[in-house]
């Protein structure tokens, strides 16, 4: 085993300066499978104290700081520092942490002497470290999993338990659904409510809420199958009845259950008769065989809703926001500040002042109000509540280590009444409310461990304000008054405009309106999620409300940027406070496609906090974050029919609209020519993105100028032409049906009479440069490419430069993550340089060098030549030479980063459009 081999190899060796980097690189690669350790971990990072010091190791993605010592050094003993102070290795690391930006501070500090690892969890900075010995690494390596997994083993366990819980709920659902009328919506509604109630009871018996473990099981176990239905009916009635209103003759086994309140058991629902299988599933599999007290309400809420949602079950599984992604929203929005405030309290040496500060912080937390306007199963609200309560428990622990608590006093102030939500699905509303109650019970149990006495959970005393309805048709202030609200959070639905229903399109047009109440012209071409941004911006006016939402990355790309962010800026003066640039969000459902998301935090309130861009695990401070999520001025690149600069016209290739009948594929070419040799004069190479990039062969029938007598003599061609006519006649589009009158011709014809440049409309995001190239006019370009007739080497050199690629990456749309090059956004808006004659000549020479380098590999496709791992040295050097020539023409330094380059291009663009 890798861990055993590593431990044996490092036994009895290790000195701080010479071997620590090798030690950690081998640990990460051999045991945890890190593929690029030089990227994953950084060594000797500077820390600016009153002198320059160096941090031994940092793992940014998992927020780990390493303080390494030589073999034999005592990790708990203070060591004299260069400034004369005496610090333990942990204190030394703490000092480094204190001077880092908050976003870069470690969650974990590891002190190590090659034989021992002391692990400090900074969620509990005063706690004792856990120690892992090198000699025990074979069995205990998993305790270092946090080095590579941000949420660590605990989250993995929560996930496993919650997913298992979802499976059990699915079994219960499947067992019950056969007893209900599956075609009756009301019956299915009763089934969903029944499942929620059963889960609450299963959790309550395992968590001790009912007073005695297995109480729910033991009560039902007394009943035979035929009596189970009535037993549940009676139990639900009792749970909904206060103790003083119950019959004094009530069966003692029922009377022992506490009053629940909260409305969970208020409605009379139809419960079907049980079968033996149903009884066994509930009592054995769901109750005795599983401990519900360990579930994560945040994860389970989503799993629960997905499990019981027939549409989701049919489409292939579960889909919910992970805890990690929720924290990407709430941590920079408010939670990091609260933790910093807590840590500041702990730094106060005066005990009286420290207690005052801790009480004030707890009071502040209890006054905060949170709103998720598309809350689904409540996972954002639930995780936010759990995070606040965990922090409050830390505060309570500190306070009551000094102050005495009255035996009847409840020290908890944060409560689920602070949380507001809107959700369109009635069942999801019930799940969200229940998930918050379970969260409350779990956190109350944690508080009880701190104060060493019990707090009554039942009857339920607090309620989350979850409202059922269409969030875009409800006045948000009616749900949560804006003067009371602090934060808007969530993951609203995103639906591309081409996939929106009539109702969704109507919602957008009703919301995305100008000062006169008229829909913006572009409102019909934006993602559905944009409506939530508009309503949030509207609500935060003249308040201190801050918002952060998970969204599709399309709202930060292409023409949607101007369509969405320009109105938000002009109407509401909002600014982006922080943002996560595009990251991939994988659904738990294996059948679902990957979703590419951004997270955007915004407000209209003035703030002194630095703006932060998160990208690939790095937190970068920005002067301004614009709608493209770039540190650059607020510039909106709008769709433009005519180029901003004096450059050749770009057009889309020719579109056949023929159902493939005017196209001759490579595998049918020989057969077609054999049957119709006289058609050869009308056959032209047909090149789209796939053909251009991958050296694939394809042809088309280009019948422009073909006379009736010529066509009459070509029976195979006539068959194809007739098929085109029939296909177009069946079209729903009137314009296409009209083109049935000219079935010999392409629907859209844009053949060039001169040599032209081809630009693929879609290209892999892994390429540094989009491959473009010159082709002769005999080639017919398909509508999968863009063409630039009459373009020169100079134009080619500019377009293939890193400057143009930086612009393209910033403003283009995306298909998943692939670049979507567009004429009206990317090309027509690009600010070209004004080179001298000498500079232009250099660009032409470097452009030719690119073509020459490609020509050295005639058997290689452009896809292979521009594969980052395969790109030939000559081609790479030619591109770099071209980059330098183009940057010189712009007056840019070759040391300029891509972000700096884009910022300068935005400035240049803004000047040109003024």
Per-range role (PLM):
Residues 1-9, 86, 112-115, 134, ...:
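Preference for the N-terminal adenyl/adenosyl cofactor-binding alpha/beta module
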Residues 286, 351-369, 412, 454, ...:
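Flexible, glycine/threonine-enriched loop-and-boundary segments that flank and lead into catalytic domains
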Residues 24-29, 88-109, 435, 439, ...:
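Metal-dependent nuclease catalytic cores in nucleic-acid-processing enzymes
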Residues 94, 530, 607-608, 616-845, ...:
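Polybasic, glycine- and aromatic-enriched phosphate-binding surface used to engage nucleic acids
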Residues 1-108, 122-126, 152, 744:
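A short, conserved, highly charged catalytic patch centered on acidic carboxylates
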Residues 375, 574, 716-724, 739-740, ...:
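Non-catalytic DNA-recognition/assembly elements of restriction-modification systems
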Residues 45-53, 101, 108, 116-164, ...:
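Signature of N6-adenine DNA methyltransferases within the class I
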Residues 39-41, 214-219, 341-364, 388-417, ...:
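Flexible phosphate/Mg2+-sensing switch loops adjacent to catalytic phosphate-binding sites
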């Amino acid at each position: 085993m890798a861990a055993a081999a590593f431990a044996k190899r490092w036994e009895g060796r290790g000195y701080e300066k010479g071997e620590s980097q090798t030690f950690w690189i081998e640990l990460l690669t051999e045991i945890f499978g890190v593929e690029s350790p030089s990227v994953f971990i950084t060594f000797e990072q500077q820390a600016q104290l009153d002198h320059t010091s160096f941090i031994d190791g940092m793992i940014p993605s998992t927020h780990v700081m390493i303080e390494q010592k030589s073999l034999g050094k005592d990790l708990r003993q203070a060591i004299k520092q260069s400034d004369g102070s005496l610090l333990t290795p942990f204190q030394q690391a703490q000092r480094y942490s204190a001077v880092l930006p908050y976003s870069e501070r470690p969650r974990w500090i590891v002190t190590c002497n090659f034989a021992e690892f002391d692990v400090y969890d900074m969620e509990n900075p005063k706690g004792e470290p856990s120690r892992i010995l090198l000699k025990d690494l074979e069995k205990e390596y998993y305790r270092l999993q946090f080095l590579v997994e941000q949420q660590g083993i605990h989250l993995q366990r929560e996930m496993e338990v919650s997913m298992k819980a979802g499976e059990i709920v699915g079994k219960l659902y499947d067992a019950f659904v056969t007893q209900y009328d599956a075609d009756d919506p009301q019956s299915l509604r009763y089934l969903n409510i029944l499942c929620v109630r059963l889960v609450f009871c299963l959790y309550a018996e395992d968590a001790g809420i009912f007073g005695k473990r297995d109480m729910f099981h033991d009560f039902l176990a007394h009943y035979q199958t035929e009596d189970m239905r009535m037993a549940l009916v009676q139990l639900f009635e009792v749970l909904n009845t206060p103790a003083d209103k119950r019959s004094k003759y009530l069966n003692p086994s029922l009377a022992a259950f506490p009053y629940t309140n909260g409305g969970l058991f208020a409605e009379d629902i139809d419960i079907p008769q049980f079968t033996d299988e149903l009884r066994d599933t509930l009592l054995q599999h769901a109750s005795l065989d599983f401990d519900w007290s360990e579930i994560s309400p945040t994860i389970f809420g989503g799993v629960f809703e997905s499990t019981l949602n027939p549409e989701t079950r049919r489409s292939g599984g579960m889909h919910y926001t992970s805890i990690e992604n929720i924290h990407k929203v709430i941590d920079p929005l408010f939670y990091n500040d609260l933790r910093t405030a807590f840590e500041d309290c702990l730094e106060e040496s005066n005990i009286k002042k420290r207690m005052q500060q801790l009480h004030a912080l707890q009071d502040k937390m209890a006054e905060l109000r949170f709103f998720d306007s598309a809350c689904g199963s409540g996972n954002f609200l639930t995780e936010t509540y759990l995070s606040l309560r965990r922090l409050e428990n830390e505060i309570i622990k500190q306070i009551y280590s000094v102050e005495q608590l009255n035996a009847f006093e409840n020290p908890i102030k944060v409560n689920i009444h602070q949380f507001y939500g809107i959700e369109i699905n009635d069942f999801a509303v019930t799940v969200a409310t229940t998930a918050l109650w379970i969260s409350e019970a779990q956190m109350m149990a944690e508080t009880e461990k701190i104060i060493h006495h019990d707090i009554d959970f039942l009857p339920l005393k607090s309620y989350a304000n979850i409202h059922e309805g269409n969030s875009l048709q409800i006045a948000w202030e009616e749900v949560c008054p804006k003067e009371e609200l602090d934060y808007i959070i969530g993951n609203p639905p995103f639906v591309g405009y081409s996939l929106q229903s009539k109702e969704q399109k109507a919602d957008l047009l009703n919301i995305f309106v100008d000062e006169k109440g008229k829909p913006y012209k572009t409102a019909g071409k934006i993602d559905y999620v944009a409506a939530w941004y508009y309503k949030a911006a509207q609500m935060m006016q003249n308040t201190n409300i801050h918002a952060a939402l998970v969204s599709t990355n399309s709202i930060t790309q292409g023409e949607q940027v101007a369509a969405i962010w320009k109105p938000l800026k002009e109407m509401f003066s909002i600014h982006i406070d922080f943002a996560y640039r595009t990251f991939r969000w994988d659904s738990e459902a294996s059948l679902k496609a990957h979703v590419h998301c951004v997270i955007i935090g915004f407000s209209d309130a003035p703030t002194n906090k630095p703006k932060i861009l998160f990208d690939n695990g790095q937190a970068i401070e920005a002067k301004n974050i614009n709608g493209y999520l770039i540190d650059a001025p607020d510039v909106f690149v709008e769709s433009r029919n005519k180029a901003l600069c004096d450059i050749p016209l770009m057009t889309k290739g020719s579109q056949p609209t023929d159902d493939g009948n005017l196209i001759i594929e490579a595998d049918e070419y020989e057969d077609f020519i054999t049957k119709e040799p006289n058609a050869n004069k009308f056959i032209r190479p047909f090149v789209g993105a796939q053909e251009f990039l991958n050296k694939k062969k394809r042809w088309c029938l280009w019948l422009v100028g073909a006379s009736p007598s010529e066509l009459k003599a070509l029976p195979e061609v006539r068959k194809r032409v007739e098929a085109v006519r029939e296909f177009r006649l069946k079209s729903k589009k009137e314009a296409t049906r009209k083109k049935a009158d000219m079935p010999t011709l392409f629907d859209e014809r844009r053949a060039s009479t001169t040599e032209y440049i081809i630009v693929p409309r879609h290209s892999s995001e892994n390429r540094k440069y989009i491959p473009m190239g010159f082709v002769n006019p005999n080639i017919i370009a398909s509508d999968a490419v863009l063409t630039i007739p009459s373009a020169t080497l100079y134009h080619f050199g500019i377009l293939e430069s890193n400057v143009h690629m930086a612009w393209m990456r910033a403003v283009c749309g995306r298909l998943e993550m692939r670049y979507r090059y567009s004429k009206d956004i990317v090309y027509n808006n690009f600010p070209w340089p004004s080179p001298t004659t000498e500079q232009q000549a250099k660009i032409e020479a470097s452009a030719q060098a690119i073509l020459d380098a490609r020509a050295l590999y005639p058997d290689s496709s452009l896809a292979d030549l521009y594969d980052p791992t395969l790109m030939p040295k000559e081609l790479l050097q030619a591109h770099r030479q071209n980059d330098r020539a183009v940057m010189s023409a712009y007056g840019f330094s070759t040391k300029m980063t891509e972000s700096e380059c884009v910022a300068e291009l935005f400035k240049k663009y803004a000047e040109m459009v003024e």
